[in-house]
Amino acid sequence: MNFSGGGRQEAAGSRGRRAPRPREQDRDVQLSKALSYALRHGALKLGLPMGADGFVPLGTLLQLPQFRGFSAEDVQRVVDTNRKQRFALQLGDPSTGLLIRANQGHSLQVPKLELMPLETPQALPPMLVHGTFWKHWPSILLKGLSCQGRTHIHLAPGLPGDPGIISGMRSHCEIAVFIDGPLALADGIPFFRSANGVILTPGNTDGFLLPKYFKEALQLRPTRKPLSLAGDEETECQSSPKHSSRERRRIQQ
């Protein structure tokens, strides 16, 4: 088995692998969630030695109780078949062996994470979009987008289902917010591209991307339609029909 691949190569690696069986898929989801927590948020609490680039020794990781029953082969399969390319594997030196990291999404500080600075308007993708949900929309209109405890705000270079879009937005998001990247860049807001193609920004000094950088918004579900950035349409919370009209008015306030 070849452990030299990483998240950036998984699309090619997965084509030559059989599709996981249903029970195997359940285990893979469990493993993926455990990896996400350990590599993005919990490394220090779990006592994992994380390098400045976000990599940790896979052998040390697999010794943790939550990873008992999983093998290096299981991890390789999850890395290879993860559609959003969340993880990367690489060979370390003989003393550490195989290393693994999350490509983005950290709440931990990872000073040497492999991020490409996007320093000019020409370097930015033509589209920068953040996916969110109705329950967050009133606050976003008022305060802007927030890092929410992570080191970056996540943006996608397209909408779910667009060609070549693998990560950056959950597929079940209800609202898409389109960002004026050149305007934010001109105001000193930095942007980066992660190893799996997600566009990241820390926002301003308070960790926010303010509403003045919103170009437009689009309702994604149940049908696509433009939304007012003034917040003057009825917030129907379409995916949550249990909300009463009184509750919807309260959400709008």
From Swiss-Prot:
It comes from the Eukaryota. Residues 243-253 have a biased composition (Basic residues). It catalyses: 2'-phospho-[ligated tRNA] + NAD(+) = mature tRNA + ADP-alpha-D-ribose 1'',2''-cyclic phosphate + nicotinamide. Pfam families: PTS_2-RNA. Signal peptide: none annotated. It is an enzyme of class 2 (transferase). One of its GO terms (biological process) is tRNA splicing, via endonucleolytic cleavage and ligation. This is tRNA 2'-phosphotransferase 1. The lineage of its organism: Eukaryota, Metazoa, Chordata, Craniata, Vertebrata. The gene is TRPT1.
